[in-house]
Amino acid sequence: MVRPPDSVKSHSGPNHPACIDPELLLKDCQIQHVRRSGPGGQHRNKVETGVVIKHLPTNITAEASEKRQQGRNRSMALFRLRVNLAIDHRTTVDPENPSLLWQRRLSNGTLKVNSEHDDFPALLTEAIDAITHFQFDIKQSSQYLKCSSSQLLKFLKKEPRAFTLLNQKRSEAGLHPLR
């Protein structure tokens, strides 16, 4: 069972699908069970343990087939879907303050979260939404999020696709890429 993230009630963009309870998110999703190659030897593909989840309102998908148990693959696919939604779907930010989740995870200007924790997609959403809101200005975004620029970049680098997206958007805006 996937534990709902602490962000359910506290994200600055509460309508973002990566920030709602995973079970509620699944109500807007189509789940498909598929056969994929993976661990388990010659009898592995006799059952459909792979899972593909598609978020219907945004058409964003994620899949998992590494494990031999369909339930574990479902949990992994759901987490990946939330990360994909965090990267590819934007909402507006609360102009006043970062979310309570962000504030709880911040300790002396350092954001403490593992990239595999259930809160990670919601925090990633908030960081990317803030950066987008401040037109890809890392300094302004980090001031809003109450952390240093280097901490914000370090957090984004935990998901390389998010960091690549940031540099792509900065380039489109005529700004230099970040390292």
Predicted regions and their residues:
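Generic structural marker for isolated residues within well-ordered, non-membrane alpha-helices
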Residues: I138
